[in-house]
């Protein structure tokens, strides 16, 4: 898919393949109190509009993202970075890759739900131009916890020829 140079080394972003599942499950388990199971990942990824991508650094899976394509939006379903690779621009590179798929007249926004107690994720996405647009009461099946609905909107004027797209809210 793409390679992005960062401060420490190259981040390579590519489509997720079956042999990535063990690494993805390990990252999921280290990142969430209620992680998805392998069956949940497989069931999701078998759907026509559900896509998985991974970020590699030094040929090691450093993070993953599962997202769903809708007519006017992209919905991030699961996203996590291995603890050893956090705060090293891996997550930012993955979100930037997803933003590059937006277009003014087609899919023009990215949405996701973030647990109300997951302040690091809220701050990460806010820093990248996402805004909380609503509260989803008792959203999760595993707890009565609420979720913030966060959204990034594509703005055509934020695109500069020859430069990467800029984030806009």
Q: Which sequence ranges carry the predicted segments?
A:
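A detector for short, charged/polar N-terminal pre-domain segments
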Residues: 2-3
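A generic structural signal for short beta-strands and their flanking turns/coil linkers
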Residues: 72-77, 108, 128, 146
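Generic recognition of short, well-ordered alpha-helical segments
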Residues: 36-39, 93, 123, 145
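Acetyl-CoA-dependent GNAT
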Residues: 6-7, 12-86, 95-97, 101-105, ...
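Conserved catalytic-core motifs of GNAT/GCN5-like acyltransferases
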Residues: 113, 126, 131-147
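Short secondary-structure capping/turn micro-motifs that flank functional sites
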Residues: 44-45, 118-119, 141-142
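Conserved glycine-rich acetyl-CoA-binding loop
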Residues: 82-96, 103-105, 109, 115-123, ...
């Amino acid at each position: 898919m793409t390679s992005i140079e960062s401060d420490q080394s190259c981040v390579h972003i590519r489509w997720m393949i079956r042999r990535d599942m063990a690494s993805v499950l390990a990252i999921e388990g280290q990142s969430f109190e209620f992680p998805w199971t392998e069956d949940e990942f497989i069931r999701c990824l078998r759907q026509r509009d559900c896509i998985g991508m991974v970020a590699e650094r030094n040929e090691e899976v450093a993070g993953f993202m599962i997202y769903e394509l809708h007519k006017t939006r992209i919905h991030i379903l699961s996203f996590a970075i291995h603890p050893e690779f956090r705060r090293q621009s891996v997550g930012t590179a993955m979100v930037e890759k997803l933003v590059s798929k937006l277009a003014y007249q087609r899919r023009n926004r990215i949405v996701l739900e973030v647990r109300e107690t997951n302040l690091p994720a809220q701050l990460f996405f806010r820093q990248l131009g996402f805004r909380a647009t609503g509260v989803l009461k008792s959203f999760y099946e595993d707890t009565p916890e609420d979720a913030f609905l966060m959204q990034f909107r594509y703005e055509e004027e934020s695109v500069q020829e020859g430069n990467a797209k800029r984030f806009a809210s």
